[in-house]
């Protein structure tokens, strides 16, 4: 399975700096001279190991070690068969019969069959599962009707032909079908890993996986350790163990790397990038990600579009990039990052340009107009919410100063640790809140669809019928140029009404010990670790 920061279409939540938890006395394998154990870092406990429920990058990173899907993305960004042996497609591209590789097994030694895929996919679509990712399967015939209670499970276009073949019927042809099916959403599941309450078992003795690793130990808020799956089909995987240590502070993680307690550091402190960028251990990877602050348009004062736009124009993104990110990011004046291109070479972002800018005079003017429209003599109190991550705190404090200086508005700041913050965000319990959206499918629709109508990720509560119609039409449009034109119109509408403040398009920084090889860095994804080797 390709490693996603969680998958594209559902577009996962991206994190600025990934770090590690309570300090262990054990040195990393590189420091000890061992060749079979990798120690790296993540910023928080995984929210879940259930791909049907996961929407954050940390969960996706760990899930990617434990489970494999039909296809995977290689280091060149191309999609290769993983559990799929071959596929047959009908004339109009609406039926795929996917044949599985022979002798692929679960970690308990039992065979992986087409029934396991059918079970997992229909479980995700089952309304009782409560998956916020179900819309990403709506390209499958009958999936939306079943998920919304308007159809039956038996009408869903997922059919077992025989134990080694799965037939998938689509609502319409999909050009990026392998990209979609490479997602962690489309993994199989063993029924033995699901309890009587339809929950995924997370006890290492009970969780049956099919990826390169199995769960060995999970010490919440300390570390999660995976070990080599002896039943995994790909014998090129030789790494015996990966320990993901959990610390939300990137400086602490950096110190652990420097003291040889980490082999791979994910997320350098911004102030260390300049120092390390000439280091041979330094790696920088582009990300198809957008860091934003989202408005809840149902909460005052952000019920007014002019007020929302005023807050966006009051943000000095150049300062944030230069001073806080040390130029390790790109200023974001739109929502869709660079990198989404047609086969003919059209770059979605470059050909359209910017939607917003830093303009304090215009910001003040719009704020006054918006307040007048609402009949407000004073602006309702505003609280900006963010996570406990050190870098997020710096950005939030900078924005607090910008709103004071450029709008004359005092705002409050409130932060929470990541797992609690996700719950707050999903409940739309905010006026203005940080979020990062990433994914490895370089397609503008993966960003714009987040704000579509009644979609599960539209936490901003923003609705525009014309925007929704354009996004819906783009989902089925097969002509790339026409599709880009539709999505440009959709983004035009988005920034006319401003449901979000774009801040930066980030890149991701790593330090990798010279003794470590085989890490694959893929645009928009977490690192691929299965082929890691460590010199003794």
What are these model-derived regions, one by one?
Residues 314-344, 391-400, 424-536:
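Detector for C-terminal structural segments
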Residues 88, 118, 132-191:
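Surface-exposed binding/hinge segments that line
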Residues 331-370, 391-393:
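Structural transition elements
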Residues 164, 170-237, 241, 251:
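Gly/Pro-rich hinge or "lid" segments in bacterial periplasmic/extracellular proteins
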Residues 368-439, 508:
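Ligand/substrate-recognition segments at binding pockets and active sites
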Residues 229-274:
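Ligand-site clamp/hinge motif
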Residues 85-133, 167, 301:
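Aromatic- and charge-enriched surface segment that lines or borders ligand/interaction sites
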Residues 41-91, 208:
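N-terminal lobe/hinge region of extracytoplasmic solute-binding protein
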């Amino acid at each position: 399975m390709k490693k996603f920061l969680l998958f594209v279409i559902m577009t996962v939540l991206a994190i600025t700096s990934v770090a590690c938890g309570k300090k262990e006395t054990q040195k990393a394998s590189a420091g000890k001279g061992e060749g079979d154990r990798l120690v790296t870092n993540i910023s928080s406990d995984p929210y879940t190991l259930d791909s049907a429920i996961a929407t954050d990058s940390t969960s996706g990173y760990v899930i990617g070690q434990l489970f494999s899907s039909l296809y995977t993305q290689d280091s060149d960004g191309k999609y290769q068969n993983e559990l799929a042996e071959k596929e047959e497609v009908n004339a109009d591209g609406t039926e795929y019969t996917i044949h599985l590789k022979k002798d692929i097994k679960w970690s308990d030694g039992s065979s992986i069959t087409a029934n396991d895929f059918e079970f997992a996919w229909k479980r995700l679509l089952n309304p009782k599962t409560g998956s916020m990712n179900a819309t990403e399967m709506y390209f499958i015939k009958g999936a939306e009707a079943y998920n919304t209670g308007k159809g039956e499970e038996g009408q869903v276009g997922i059919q077992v032909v025989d134990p080694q073949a799965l037939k998938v019927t689509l609502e319409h042809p999909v050009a990026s079908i392998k990209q979609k099916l490479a997602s962690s959403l489309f993994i199989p599941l063993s029924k033995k890993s699901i309890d009587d309450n339809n929950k995924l078992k997370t006890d290492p003795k009970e969780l049956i996986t099919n990826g390169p690793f199995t769960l060995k130990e999970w010490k919440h808020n300390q570390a999660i350790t995976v070990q080599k799956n002896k039943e995994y089909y790909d014998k090129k995987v030789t790494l015996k163990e990966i320990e993901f240590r959990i610390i939300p502070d990137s400086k602490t993680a950096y110190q652990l790397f420097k003291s040889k307690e980490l082999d791979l550091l994910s997320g350098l402190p911004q102030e260390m990038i300049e120092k390390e960028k000439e280091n041979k251990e330094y790696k920088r990877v582009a990300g198809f990600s957008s860091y934003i602050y989202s408005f809840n348009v149902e909460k005052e004062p952000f019920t007014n579009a002019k007020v929302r736009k005023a807050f966006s124009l009051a943000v000095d993104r150049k300062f944030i990039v230069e001073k806080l990110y040390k130029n390790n990011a790109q200023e974001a004046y739109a929502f869709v990052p660079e990198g989404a291109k047609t086969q003919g070479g059209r770059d979605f972002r470059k050909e359209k340009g910017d939607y917003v800018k830093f303009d304090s005079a215009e910001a003040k003017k719009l704020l006054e107009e918006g307040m007048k429209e609402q009949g407000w003599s004073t602006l309702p109190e505003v609280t900006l919410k963010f996570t406990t991550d050190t870098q997020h705190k710096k950005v939030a404090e900078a924005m607090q100063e910008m709103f004071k200086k450029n709008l004359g508005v005092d705002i409050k700041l409130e932060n929470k640790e990541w797992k609690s913050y996700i719950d707050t965000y999903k409940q739309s319990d905010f006026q203005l809140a940080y979020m990062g959206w990433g994914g490895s499918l370089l397609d503008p629709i993966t960003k714009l669809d987040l704000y579509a109508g009644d979609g599960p990720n539209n936490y901003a509560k923003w609705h525009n019928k014309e925007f929704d119609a354009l996004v819906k039409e783009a989902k089925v449009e097969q002509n790339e140029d026409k599709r880009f034109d539709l999505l440009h119109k959709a983004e035009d509408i988005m920034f006319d009404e401003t449901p979000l403040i774009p801040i930066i398009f980030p890149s991701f920084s790593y330090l990798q010990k010279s003794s470590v090889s085989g890490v694959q860095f893929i645009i928009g994804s977490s690192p691929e670790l299965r082929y890691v080797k460590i010199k003794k």
